[in-house]
């Protein structure tokens, strides 16, 4: 495996969008988990559990989590016996993740590495699965991200994405959009969150790919047996693809 980049290593200046997002997520890192629970009414735990089951992760296996953040998804995937490497460009988020890993007694089984989703600092054909949760809306190149995740997993391994989606159920979709675009920033303001960040998150969905487009992106990365599952009325989608071999 290539040498991971230490958390305190100086990097070249990233593109403006990347740097802006890195700073923004750094600001919300201390309260990120709390606001996830608040804004999703606690459903994000159920979503991750479902997505983790799609990984078909073997006992004692090795997982890769892209956009690891505070390590919730990685912990869900690896269970009590697995190991993981988590990659994220935001050091404050990973510091919050390290604190959580220590509290859960999993610090020795999960390595957090500074890096970008489009250029993962890991060797190929190495991981039993690669996951990403609520990250793709923030990357600069989704095709390249999936290509890197596909490169990293061993033949037969799965790539799994968990993301916010646009509901298609008549009657529910307008209610979701009202909540997501209008009420969630208001809740952030009322409960002392970063209003700018929680205004960005709804905006990011407007320009995000459809389910079909994400599936096509997986296929362009060489993944097969691509499919998706809608959760919570279609407000969340889990995409799954398999590396041939």
Residue ranges: model-predicted function:
Residues 62-119:
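Class I SAM-dependent methyltransferase SAM/SAH-binding core
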Residues 118-129:
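A short acidic, Gly/Pro-enriched loop at the edge of an enzyme's catalytic core
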Residues 32, 130-131:
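Hydrophobic beta-strand segment of the Class I
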Residues 224-245:
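Core SAM-dependent methyltransferase catalytic element
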Residues 158-187:
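Conserved class I S-adenosyl-L-methionine
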Residues 1-31, 180, 191:
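N-terminal, positively charged/glycine-rich alpha-helical extensions of SAM-dependent methyltransferases
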Residues 143-155:
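A short glycine-rich, Lys/Arg-flanked "PGG" loop and its adjoining helix->strand segment in the class I
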Residues 41-61:
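Conserved alpha-helix/loop element of class I SAM-dependent methyltransferases that forms part
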